[in-house]
Amino acid sequence: MPVPPPPPPPLPPPPPPLGAPPPPPPSAPPVSTDTSSLRRADPKGRSALLADIQQGTRLRKVTQINDRSAPQIESSKGTNKEGGGSANTRGASTPPTLGDLFAGGFPVLRPAGQRDVAGGKTGQGPGSRAPSPRLPNKTISGPLIPPASPRLGNTSEAHGAARTAPPRPNVPAPPPPTPPPPPPPLPPPLPSSSPIKTPLVSPPGPLTKGNLPVVAPPVPCAPPPPPPPPPPTPPPLPPASVLSDKAVKPQLAPLHLPPIPPPLPLLPPCGYPGLKAEPASPAQDAQEPPAPPPPLPPYASCSPRASLPAPPLPGVNSSSETPPPLPPKSPSFQAPPQKAGAQALPAPPAPPGSQPFLQKKRHGRPGAGGGKLNPPPAPPARSPTTELSSKSQQATAWTPTQQPGGQLRNGSLHIIDDFESKFTFHSVEDFPPPDEYKPCQKIYPSKIPRSRTPGPWLQAEAVGQSSDDIKGRNSQLSLKTLR
């Protein structure tokens, strides 16, 4: 209330100066008489300026306008209507508009507190007041928006339950370390690297649901947990399978060691993480439940970072009947092929040689182990960038041994190969050999003394012609050398 009154006071001071200018043309005394008469006869104002000044004085006197506006805007509307009528009759509406703006502004602030009443009335108010009601409405919608965000979260949970999933991955993750006392060391490294651990547990979910894999690939980096929520029913199987896998891994690995040697080339790529071996063992433990294969995709999800681990496996995975449908369903190319590979070749993934290798690879995957395996392939692939044939030969040489591993660990190399595979390059042999370089004396016109003697212009012209001839000769020589 005290704040609104101050604005009107400034208005009164201007009236005297404004009143003063009109009187100056006549004599000084008549000025006072005119002002007094005008003040006495309000409706009969001689000039619009005087009428405006008088209106301002009235507004100043009626400081209660602020009080009227304070309770509700309707009162201010009534005052506006009255003032507007008087202003129209007098021909000056500017001061009342200013007063309305001030009065409307203050009540708008008050209704902000009263969202319900102020919202409707402010909406009825003039355009200047309308924005303020919109703000309260927005504030009301603001609370609604937060629920919307939870709804979005719910939708995300329905699609991937990224936020809710984390607790689930955490829950299954703790059990695996506890059940197998010997393997606990292996899980700890994975927990140390949260991203890796989460993918192990979370990927199973996305794999179980073909639609979710889309969310899984983007999520694997930060929130791999989303996939697990989708398969609430299978999750018990995956945790049990994971626990049983970890507990039985030692047994499974020795059992499948004989088949391991042949698949080793394929396994090393998957084995570099050592995680793939684990998924394979789950598949072996329980091939009936689809949950065990999902664990493999988690590693695949980790491998997707390599970006092309799957392509090598699809050929091998095609043999398995069930895997083929899965790969088409899941947009993530890497995860489905690995699933197929796990199902088709449960023994090969499990047999990365022996658990000691798995442990080493697991420890190495976050850090040195994987890096050591992959770096060697990188230089050969990059060194012969100029010659595709040599590169392809080297790539083939690497493929039997560590091609998948290199692809999984070092996705950049594989990406480079794919990028170059999109284009066809000619080998150096396809191009004709360059002509032999024959040293020849070149004559440059700049070195020719232009004016041996200050002769006539004809000599200069002759020199110019000779320079042109020399240029032509040089160009021909250069072309021959280039050919």
UniProtKB/Swiss-Prot annotation:
Signal peptide residues on this chain, from the entry's feature table: none
Motif WASP-binding motif per record, residues: 424-448
Modified residues (Phosphoserine): S149, S202, S383
Localisation per UniProt entry: Cytoplasm
Top-level taxon of the source organism: Eukaryota
Listed Polar residues bias regions: 63-78, 87-96, 473-483
Summary of subunit composition and partner proteins: Interacts with WASL, and monomeric and filamentous actin.
Role played: May be a regulator of cytoskeletal organization. May have a role in spermatogenesis.
Homology family: Belongs to the verprolin family.
Domain notes: The WH2 domain is found in a number of putative actin-binding proteins. The profilin-binding motif has been implicated in the interaction with profilin and SH3 domains.
Protein name per UniProt: WAS/WASL-interacting protein family member 3
Organism: Homo sapiens
